Structures are given as C-alpha cells and as structure tokens.
C-alpha cells in the first residue's frame, strides 16, 4: 500500500511517500544519505544498497562500542560508512573515540553532550582536527549543549555558529 504525505495541519496530500528503494535510486550518485536508526534493519537495508548501487553513499550511525560494531557488521564496514555516536557525558567517551580512530578510522563522529559545563567538546575540536570530522545533532537541546535548532533560530551564533566556530562541527543534523 502506498502512503501519502500529510501537510503541516496533518491533512493528507496527493504526494506519495517513496519507498527506501525508490529514494535510493533517485539519490544514486548525487548525495550522501544518513539512514537514521537503520542499523536495526541492517541486513534488509544492505540488500537494498547493493541492489541500487548506493553502498558508498550511505552513512549508518550507532552508539555501540567498536568491538560490538565489528562483531555485528564485520566485512560490511569495508563498503558502508559507519559513524559512531559518542555521548561525551560518559566517563569513557575519550577512550571510546580513540578506540574507533585506532581500529576503524571513521570519517566522522556524532558527538552528544548536555551542557557547556562539559569541557570535552571544546578539547575535541583541536584533538580531532585532521583525524576525523565532527557532527552535531541539533534536534533537541540536550544533544548539543543547548546549541540546538531553536537556539539557532533566535541567534545563529549561539546555535549553529557556536557548534561550527567554537566546537569545530563540519556537519550538523537538523530538521529546520
């Protein structure tokens, strides 16, 4: 059954929701795609990536340790871009980052932290420079020290600007 999109008032529109396969075919060779939460369905997603020839355009993310990622995805890591999500408020955050860099060389990390009281995000701007890229998620205020979408709408420099200029973000996940 085909699904229809709804507008901002939750009214059904004539526009259809594409299947993942249709979206992958359309995006082939054009853009990178972050398949959020797709790690839960990795086998099915991987089959579609192979079928559509888009394995090198997909970013899969997760918050597992390097050991668990290697165990779960193994040889797939040679074809699919895997980006670790690291909660900087956890005690072992720096060790987790270094483990991934040493063993997997990820192109980027999604870094999470609740408040600017945490000194680690500022330190990582310099320590990760030239080694990997930094990605921040700005959907909620607890994911990037309150430098989220809402803060950015009020004052760019306190939101996205802070993440880019002060914390070295090269990628920002937003829904605005």
Q: Model regions: which residues?
A:
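C-terminal active-site rim and adjoining tail of enzyme catalytic domains
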Residues: 10-13, 85-176
């Amino acid at each position: 059954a085909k699904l229809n999109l709804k507008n901002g008032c939750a009214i059904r529109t004539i526009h259809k929701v594409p299947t993942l396969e249709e979206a992958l075919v359309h995006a082939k060779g054009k853009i990178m795609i972050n398949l959020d939460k797709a790690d839960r369905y990795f086998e099915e997603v991987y089959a579609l990536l192979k079928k559509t020839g888009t394995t090198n355009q997909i970013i899969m993310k997760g918050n597992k340790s390097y050991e668990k990622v290697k165990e779960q995805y193994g040889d797939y890591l040679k074809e699919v871009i895997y980006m670790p999500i690291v909660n900087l408020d956890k005690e072992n955050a720096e060790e987790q980052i270094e483990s991934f860099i040493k063993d997997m060389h990820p192109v980027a990390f999604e870094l999470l932290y609740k408040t600017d009281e945490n000194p680690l995000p500022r330190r990582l701007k310099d320590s990760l420079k030239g080694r990997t890229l930094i990605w921040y998620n700005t959907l909620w205020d607890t994911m990037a020290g309150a430098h989220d979408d809402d803060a950015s709408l009020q004052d760019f420099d306190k939101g996205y600007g802070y993440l880019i200029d002060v914390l070295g973000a090269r990628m920002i996940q937003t829904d605005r």
